[in-house]
Amino acid sequence: MAETTWNRHHVLSLADFSADELNIVLQTANSFKDVLYRKTKKVPTLQARLVTNLFFEPSTRTRSSFELAAKRLSADVLNFSPGTSSLSKGETILDTAKTFLAMGADMMVIRHQHSGVPQMIAQAMDDLGEQVGVLNAGDGFHEHPSQGLLDLFTLCTTLDPDQPTTHLLTGKKIAIVGDILHSRVARSNLSSLVTCGADVHLAGPPTLLPKEFADYGAQVHWSLEPALEQADFVMTLRLQHERMSQHLIPSIREYHQQFGITRDRIQRCQPQVKVLHPGPVNRGVEISSDLMDDESLSLIPHQVTSGIAVRMALLYLISNRSR
């Protein structure tokens, strides 16, 4: 396993990840990928370790993926649900985390609707002198590092299944389309893709794509065509209705007419173009159903599988820095 230069105790953001660190994750995930296709889909790597999934915000894909990743590594797993917890009785988030610490948690996977909560808990664990690794599973509009890493792994293994490395994306044009404003996935992907040297283009209506996103190192387009022109990969993002406080698009129908990814529209892209979506997908809104279901064009199922391998890698790497 490639852990010799891994020094992170927590994974909270991809903004300060180096290309070398990204490569460590890619290489480690690639080694675990084979486990997923074996008859016995389990290794004893994290036997007797306790992983706690503290999801203060609803999640199906991410929580299930982290849980399965931990179990594939033979870890014990505790899942937290705020609806049936002492939070409803007035307990603070930090006290909840300390409760799981007292139960012997080695790693905490945290999702919260407000930005900064995983960082706050990680800092609290450090201040207490506890060697507990914290992984950000999505916080508000901030970031979703494991999704960014699994998308990176999906892209790189598509280009080279045997040796996925960051240099494969150097100069590749990647279009990210949709609700960039509310997307923590977009922020994590921007950080990692720019670090890899990719040519990143963002497309969306001005209400969902502020021009300040150019500061990330991407090109910003308020129409779809220039972003798709000769693109190698197209990543479309879900309209995040639950995070919108105002009516930022005229209608779902008009959004699809202007920014929906369809078979006709990807004719502008490279002939070998592939399409991604972090899920859940609003069929017929962000992407047409026929394109989503076309195995020759859609990488969406591969993203799900990649997520397990990448989260196995993160838990493994973090575990070497925790107690």
Curated annotation (Swiss-Prot):
L-aspartate binds at K89, R184, R238. Transmembrane segments: none annotated. GO terms for molecular function: amino acid binding; aspartate carbamoyltransferase activity. Carbamoyl phosphate binds at R61, T62, R111, H144, Q147, G279, P280. Pfam families: OTCace, OTCace_N. It is an enzyme of class 2 (transferase). Pathway: Pyrimidine metabolism; UMP biosynthesis via de novo pathway; (S)-dihydroorotate from bicarbonate: step 2/3. It catalyses: carbamoyl phosphate + L-aspartate = N-carbamoyl-L-aspartate + phosphate + H(+). Catalyzes the condensation of carbamoyl phosphate and aspartate to form carbamoyl aspartate and inorganic phosphate, the committed step in the de novo pyrimidine nucleotide biosynthesis pathway. PANTHER family: ASPARTATE CARBAMOYLTRANSFERASE, ORNITHINE CARBAMOYLTRANSFERASE, MITOCHONDRIAL. NCBIfam families: asp_carb_tr (TIGR00670), PRK00856.1 (NF002032). Belongs to the aspartate/ornithine carbamoyltransferase superfamily. ATCase family. This is Aspartate carbamoyltransferase catalytic subunit. The gene is pyrB.
